[in-house]
Amino acid sequence: MSVVIRLARAGTKKRPVYHVVVADSRFPRDGRFIERLGYFNPLLPKDNEARLKLDMEKVKAWVAKGAQPSDRVSRFLDAAGVKKREARNNPQKAVPRKERKAQAEAAAKG
């Protein structure tokens, strides 16, 4: 059983609120979950304290048990200083594709 800490959408249409939950990765996004750890309200200003509310003791306990935070939750945990988020590395991003490389060579010759 792969356990993840992720966001489950709640709220009404065009007014989202997200619950931070611990769930099995096979469960639906807004469906069954094991435990609710807090909430996130993206409509509030970034400097508002009520924008993100987490029970840090529960979060630390679940991370210690091996729960993997989703990308967005890992950003929250990094900002709170709970778990360091490793930077993404994509060395192939700057390499031009074959078609672009051929076009550049043709333009250089022509």
UniProtKB/Swiss-Prot annotation:
Keywords: Ribonucleoprotein, Ribosomal protein. GO terms for biological process: translation. InterPro entries: Ribosomal_bS16, Ribosomal_bS16_dom_sf. It comes from the Bacteria. Residues 79-110 are annotated as: Disordered. Signal peptide: none annotated. It holds the Pfam family Ribosomal_S16. Transmembrane segments: none annotated. GO terms for molecular function: structural constituent of ribosome. The keyword Ribonucleoprotein applies. One of its GO terms (cellular component) is cytoplasm. Belongs to the bacterial ribosomal protein bS16 family. This is Small ribosomal subunit protein bS16.
